[in-house]
Amino acid sequence: LGDGEDVVAVMLPDDLVLPAGVMEKMVQVRERLGGSVLCAFNVTREEVFNYGVFDVEELDIDFDGFEVKRVRGMVEKPVPEEAPSTLVATGRYLLDRGIFDALRRITPGKGGELQLTDAIELMIQEGHPVHVVVHEGKRHDLGNPGGYIPANVDFGLRHPKYGPALYTALKQIMADFEAETA
């Protein structure tokens, strides 16, 4: 980052977050509260082992219809019984420039890799403000075919130009499939 820059946006390419617009909400939170702002989704307790999980506390601040919480800590891929919540990190981050120093100071974590979650946790422990925007939309995991294919369909159906034709084609494909497998 240059001298006048103090934030970096990170958008992981294997997460499709719908509908669009969560980054704009995150910018609003950062402008109002400072620090780093992350996107969170609620998952079931059984799913938490796949994610970085937030330990959060409520804020008594209104953000025009979207939920914001203060992050007290993060745990990378905990067993369900040890998860502090069911709010998980979802590939959208506005990180204060301090993240670069934190990344230099952490050691490899889960899987023998440097984990962004560990660097964020270090910043939290050192008093850096971190908040989450709880996104009420959908998240698709593009990192495997089981998530990639439905994500493309979902995204395509929402497209103003291609959505109606895709919807019609999918109805026909489903009807043909059901007839073939009946």
Region locations from a protein language model:
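Conserved beta-loop-beta/alpha segment of the NTase-like Rossmann-fold superfamily
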Residues: 1-58, 95-97, 103-106
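Catalytic-core segments of class I nucleotidyltransferases/pyrophosphorylases
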Residues: 9, 27-31, 59-140, 145-168
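Intrinsic disorder at enzyme termini
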Residues: 166-182
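Short, mixed-charge aromatic SLiMs
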Residues: 17-22, 121-128, 145, 173-178
